[in-house]
């Protein structure tokens, strides 16, 4: 069965385009019906980020869930990992995060979590899609069995305490000047407060959401403002989260970016030395730099690769017993603490290492020299450009040209109509030639569709 709604990270699209109140209501009904298991009164936790359309989607989903007899617990703007944590903590049957993650305000999305706080499997999402295509009128609750909705107070404090508990009790951030960029998103209240409670000297940017400015020239996908602020304030470190705070990028005291691959290297080495790695290796995606793989090999650690998407990283971690994984983009999963990527908790693990070593972030967080990596995107309107013979030929030729001295990855995005072409290797000029040839072939195929 083809997936008409769900991508690699829930349902995502333009607000009042794909993501309409009608769809949100139907998702609430379908997911609510599917997760009403057992005889207890069923509950769902709903959180959101700060984009304007969040109100519209939130109320539509409340209508959907309550119409099938499920109670709704509204927590307001909260990080995605906080919603996952609260779903389990509140003994809910289901969790919902209304967010389009790092996208701009025009988009929105719906992420669903099971009762243990894990994202739903492909099979469960397919079951929801089947229900979305059916008429559910005859499955609605009777009048006396409709669900109730209420807003929950104190959830910010719950997440702050959860995050703080991931650090040793005797470790504080006293003496560290930290600039944090919350992307005008879901973490704008909780993360600065948590850092302050841990003893850091906190300078906050991206903490004035207005419904329109989420991820706009700020956050983990646009860290330039953070880099400038770190240098300006002579800070020790910068933390950039995205709109729903499930990914993080750091900036060292010189204003240089530390991406997800480097963060994985820092945490992996630290945890290995402390005996905290569950297995001698970590899990990352096919997008992680070959430099990370070589660094880990030097540490006696294995890099296990998965398809792109933090859910696939987590699935492999759980299946094979790893407790550290993530993506180059900054999704870092620490399964000892969280059931999904948690940008802030990942940042805290790095801050803990910095505090213990008492060395500058620039020395602690640049563990390897990344191989030159070229990533280009080709947008298309319709069809399947990757099925074109010319594209297949260009990919085959490119792989032969790299000949074991690099990697080539060509894939469709799981969240938008884009073909991503990534190449990396020791010879940057050769990699760029190979990528450009494939981009041209994909572009021609897309234009002919």
From Swiss-Prot:
Active-site residues, Swiss-Prot/TrEMBL: 101
Single GO MF annotation: phosphoglucosamine mutase activity
Keyword Cell membrane: no
Catalytic activity: alpha-D-glucosamine 1-phosphate = D-glucosamine 6-phosphate
GO BP, sorted A to Z: carbohydrate metabolic process; peptidoglycan biosynthetic process; UDP-N-acetylglucosamine biosynthetic process
Post-translational modification: Activated by phosphorylation.
UniProt key word Chloroplast: no
Co-factor requirement: Mg(2+)
One GO term describing the cellular component: cytosol
Superkingdom to which the source organism belongs: Bacteria
UniProt entry keywords in alphabetical sequence: Isomerase, Magnesium, Metal-binding, Phosphoprotein
Sites of Phosphoserine modification: 101
Cofactor note: Binds 1 Mg(2+) ion per subunit.
Positions with a binding annotation for Mg(2+): 101, 242, 244, 246
Enzyme Commission code(s) on record: 5.4.2.10
Biological role stated in the UniProt entry: Catalyzes the conversion of glucosamine-6-phosphate to glucosamine-1-phosphate.
Enzyme class, spelled out: isomerase
Protein name: Phosphoglucosamine mutase
Similarity section: Belongs to the phosphohexose mutase family.
Chain coiled-coil ranges: none
